[in-house]
């Protein structure tokens, strides 16, 4: 075999490994300054349905097959400044392994103020659907998949006291989700209002009753409609997970990963409601 043939064969043998090397990113998301692992951080291609969530130790693995070097790779987490990379840069930096450092976020004073002199009332808003005659299943259990409902409050300041999720059927031994509260802009979900992450864990036995999340420790005040959503941050495994549902109960909002565009599904509402304290 001459030198030219030998070189060609070596290149052909190396090609599959080089291609595989560039198709997957691996790394660890840590806190800048402390090196502490950041669990359940969001990693994804901005504006596209390609993403994942870091595990309990901050490790992540993301398939980037078919993505452009000009795409934006975004790392984000509640309580931290988001970090963007051009995918071409990240492809080189994280093809083997890398540490991604996120900086803690500083929050200003809340913009929504509730007048203590005004008379207040407690309201249940959203879809407080207890009947399981109609259900809506979760067809996508991708890490980072998010689903929820828009809560209307008629443009009066309100304090969120409790979130309730009504589950029609759950065959998973344990479900672990992250609760998100998004403001709205032009009738679409906007910024996440939470300053610290809120996780919800329950067993299939506990799912037979409404899942209630006490929001009083978080002091979340809203001025306008807001989206309540739940996000898959741990693998669910095999099984079924259905929420109660009802016709003409607003739309289901969902996105496949944290960086994907929000989409809506028809006039079928899912059993997510909120208890709020609002000015009369």
Regions picked out by a protein language model, each given a short descriptive name:
Residues 23-38:
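Structural motif
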Residues 35, 41-45, 58, 73, ...:
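Hydrophobic beta-strand segments
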Residues 49-59:
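Short, acidic Ser/Thr/Gly-rich low-complexity loop/linker segments typical of extracellular
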Residues 60-62, 96-98, 209-213:
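Short strand-edge motifs at loop-to-beta-strand transitions and within beta-strands
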Residues 61-71, 218-223:
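Short Pro-Gly-centered beta-turn/loop motif in secreted/extracellular proteins
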Residues 72-87:
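A short, solvent-exposed loop/turn motif at the edges and junctions
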Residues 90-116:
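Extracellular beta-sheet/turn segments enriched in Thr/Pro/Gly and aliphatic residues
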Residues 107-184, 225, 231-280:
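Beta-sheet-rich sandwich/jelly-roll-like modules and their strand-loop junctions
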């Amino acid at each position: 075999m001459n030198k030219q043939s030998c070189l060609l064969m070596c290149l052909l043998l190396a090609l599959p490994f080089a291609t595989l090397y560039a198709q997957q990113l691996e790394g660890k998301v840590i806190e800048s300054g402390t090196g502490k692992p950041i669990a359940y951080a969001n990693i994804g291609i901005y504006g596209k349905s390609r993403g994942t969530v870091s595990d309990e130790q901050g490790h992540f693995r993301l398939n980037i097959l078919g993505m452009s070097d000009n795409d934006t790779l975004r790392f984000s987490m509640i309580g931290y400044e988001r970090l963007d990379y051009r995918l071409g840069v990240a492809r080189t930096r994280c093809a083997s392994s890398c540490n991604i450092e996120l900086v803690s976020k500083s929050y200003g004073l809340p913009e929504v103020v509730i007048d203590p002199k005004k008379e207040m009332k407690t309201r249940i808003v959203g879809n407080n659907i207890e009947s399981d005659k109609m259900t809506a299943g979760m067809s996508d259990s991708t890490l980072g998949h998010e689903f929820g409902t828009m809560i209307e409050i008629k443009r009066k300041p309100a304090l969120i006291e409790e979130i309730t999720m009504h589950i029609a059927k759950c065959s998973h031994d344990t479900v672990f989700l992250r609760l998100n509260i998004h403001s709205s802009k032009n009738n679409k979900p906007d910024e996440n209002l939470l300053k610290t992450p809120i996780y919800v864990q329950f067993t299939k036995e506990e799912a037979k009753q409404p899942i209630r999340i006490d929001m009083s420790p978080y002091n979340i005040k809203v001025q306008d409609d807001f989206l309540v959503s739940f996000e898959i941050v741990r693998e669910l495994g095999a099984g079924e997970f259905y929420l109660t549902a009802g016709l003409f109960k607003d739309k289901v909002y969902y996105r496949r990963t944290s960086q994907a565009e929000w989409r809506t599904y028809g006039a079928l509402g899912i059993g997510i409601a909120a208890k709020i304290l609002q000015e009369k």
